Structures are given as C-alpha cells and as structure tokens.
Curated annotation (Swiss-Prot):
InterPro entries: DUF6378. The lineage of its organism: Viruses, Duplodnaviria, Heunggongvirae, Uroviricota, Caudoviricetes. This is Gene 55 protein. It comes from Mycobacterium phage L5 (Mycobacteriophage L5). It comes from the Viruses. Residues 132-156 are annotated as: Disordered.
Amino acid sequence: MSILTTAEEIINGQRAQDYGDAKENHERIATLWGAYKRGVEFTPEDVAVMMILLKIARFMENGYHQDTVVDIAGYAGVLEKMQLPEDERYPKGPRQWDTLLDVPADVKTVTNATGVKWIYYPNGLHHTKVGKRRWSGGNASSHEERMRGPFTEVAE
C-alpha cells in the first residue's frame, strides 16, 4: 500500500475515531501551545505545519523511516482537510478498496462487486488467505467471481 493511501486511511479512519475532528483537535493543540508560550497565538494550520517540521527534523537526524514519511503525508492531509467545511471533512458512507489486500486491519466484513460477503477471521479459521489476513468468502460459482472488486465495507 502506498504512503499516501496509508496516510489517508489513518487520518480518515482510526485517528479520526480516536481524536475526533482534525480541525477541533488542532485548535485545542494551538490553544495549549499559545498558553505555554504566553501570548503567542497559534492557528490549527500552524500546528499541522509545525508537526510536519518536527517530522522533517526527525528525518534529518535518522534518515528515511516509512512511518515518518506517512506522518508527514498525514499532517499535509490534515492541513488540507481543515480547509473544508465541517460536514465535508470525513467521507460519508462505506469505504471501498480494489482488492482484499488493500482492506485495512480495522475492517472485519466487506462485500465484493458480485455481492459475495467476506469476513475476516483472526484465529486462523479461513477459506482464503490474502496477504497476511485470513478471509472467508461466501458462495460464488467461481474463484474469479469471489475475488472481483471493489470490496465495500459492511457496517457492523
């Protein structure tokens, strides 16, 4: 999976669930930084840019680490997201992926283009191993039909 895809999944997935709206979170950080610096005001955009600079400083010291570059891309994505109206910041509806390999670990059930329901089984009970994950796919007349994307998240 590409760095940009990984960053996009992080900022629209678990991080959004854990920390809430990106702009509200960065406003909170800006307020705390301003209080710490006594009188210096920071914007949410300042926070995102300074976090990118922090990651660049780490990159300069330690060289390439994929997670550092993913974080830089993620903060750039958050910076872009903060410019959108609140109701447009996070995608509505189920997410989709081209292959089962692209489905992130937090997703447990998907359906494919032909309606086959795939369920993730972490305990090793499976019909099909795709990458490092084990899936059970429902009834279909052929392997090609079962594996046809896109794969759409099923809300649980």
